[in-house]
């Protein structure tokens, strides 16, 4: 598939041509699947989890031997949402292989009702699932697992933002039920992906939790600078354009190798660079200035939603980029933040709503563009 801009910023996997590196992680994930090791995949949001999963699912050793299913449950709030999302994904994936497989699914999962229609834009057939009047989400989940286990080909199910289940009503009970179903599977392998390191760690590394030590961990860090440099310069060259190496290094450093933010900037730089031209450091300034203009009202509204104490803390964190000792005397005095207890009070809700992320050794504003915008404006 040929695209106009090689720097993809959607989470949907396109092809290996537009996928950078991750050779080691891909090999590990393929090995886990082929050797029936369930995987817990953890990284920051927008670091490339779904892209990695899509890439692995497209490899010949997986695509030719396995049925693969992927759902992102970030927007789900209940087991009903989860079940219908998984059921819809299975139906849509099976559609391309014939009506009989879809019919088999609907016969096995009798607790859901399907309606069929044509997509008004693409004209492709679309499936909508709803729970039957007498069904329960728990029963539907059991029936879906039964269907997966009866498949003629082994199945792989990837669930992104898995930690969301912990926030469901009766989340602990649902997680325990899932663990019981998963451990009894002989024909289905699972990838549990998540971006909240603390919650994923609690679910999979705490002895009292059902999923404790049940999966092989895989952590997704930044792509190496040399690999990403080759990726960026290669796409510019293939399209009759050039880019200075220093330009790539600067963007990489600015975002600490965080994939999506780099991709977004280079998407803009690529668009602004005509064939025969060379992108340089000025290209970065122009691209980021344009990004600030686009998100100006969004960022202003985000600041309006926080208290004055929270705003002061956000400004301080943005100025530092990342803060190791957020309640330390030096940080407090540098930005006139009053007391450590006041910081803790302001920090707690910002972490809960994911405005600030607590990493292994520091705190930082989750949205890197928001952080840069604050640092420049204040």
Which residues does each predicted region cover?
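Amphipathic alpha-helical "lid/sensor" segments that cap RecA-like P-loop NTPase cores
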Residues: 233-297, 308, 360
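Conserved AAA+ ATPase "SRH/arginine-finger" region at the nucleotide-binding site
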Residues: 75, 216-227
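C-terminal leucine-rich, beta-strand-based interaction scaffolds used for sensing/assembly
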Residues: 2-6, 246, 293, 297-378
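Conserved Walker B catalytic segment
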Residues: 128-196, 205
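P-loop NTPase nucleotide-binding core
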Residues: 42-47, 51-156
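Short regulatory helix/loop adjacent to the ATP-binding pocket of P-loop NTPases
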Residues: 197-215
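A short, basic N-terminal segment
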Residues: 1-44, 357
């Amino acid at each position: 598939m040929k695209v106009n801009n090689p720097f993809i910023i959607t989470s949907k996997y396109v092809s290996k041509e537009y996928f950078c590196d991750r050779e080691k992680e891909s090999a590990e994930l393929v090995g886990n699947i082929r050797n029936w090791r369930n995987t817990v995949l953890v990284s920051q949001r927008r670091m490339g989890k779904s892209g990695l999963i899509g890439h692995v699912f497209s490899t010949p050793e997986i695509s030719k031997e396995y049925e693969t299913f992927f759902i992102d449950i970030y927007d789900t709030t209940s087991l009903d949402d989860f079940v219908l999302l998984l059921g819809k994904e299975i139906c849509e994936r099976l559609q391309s292989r014939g009506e009989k497989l879809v019919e088999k699914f609907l016969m096995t999962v009798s607790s859901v009702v399907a309606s069929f229609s044509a997509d008004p834009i693409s004209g492709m057939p679309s499936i909508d699932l709803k729970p039957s009047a007498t069904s329960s989400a728990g029963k539907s989940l059991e029936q879906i697992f039964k269907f997966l286990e009866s498949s003629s080909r082994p199945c792989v199910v990837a669930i992104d933002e898995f930690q969301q289940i912990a926030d469901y009503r009766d989340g602990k009970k649902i997680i325990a039920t899932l663990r019981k179903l998963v451990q009894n599977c002989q024909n289905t392998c699972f990838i549990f992906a998540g971006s909240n390191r603390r919650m994923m760690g609690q679910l999979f590394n705490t002895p009292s939790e059902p999923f404790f030590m049940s999966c092989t961990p895989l952590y997704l860090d930044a792509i190496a600078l040399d690999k990403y440099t080759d990726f960026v310069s290669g796409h510019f060259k293939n399209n009759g354009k050039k880019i200075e190496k220093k330009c790539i290094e600067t963007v990489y450093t600015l975002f600490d190798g965080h994939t999506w933010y780099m991709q977004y900037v280079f998407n803009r730089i690529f668009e602004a660079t005509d064939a025969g031209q060379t992108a340089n450091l000025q290209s970065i300034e122009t691209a980021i200035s344009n990004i600030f203009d686009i998100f100006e009202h969004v960022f202003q509204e985000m600041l309006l939603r926080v208290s004055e104490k929270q705003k002061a803390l956000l400004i301080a964190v943005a100025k530092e980029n990342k803060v190791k000792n957020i309640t330390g005397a030096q940080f407090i005095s540098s930005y006139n933040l009053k007391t450590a207890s006041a910081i803790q009070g302001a920090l707690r809700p910002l972490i809960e709503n994911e405005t600030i992320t607590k990493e292994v050794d520091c705190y930082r504003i989750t949205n890197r563009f928001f952080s840069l915008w604050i640092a420049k404006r204040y």
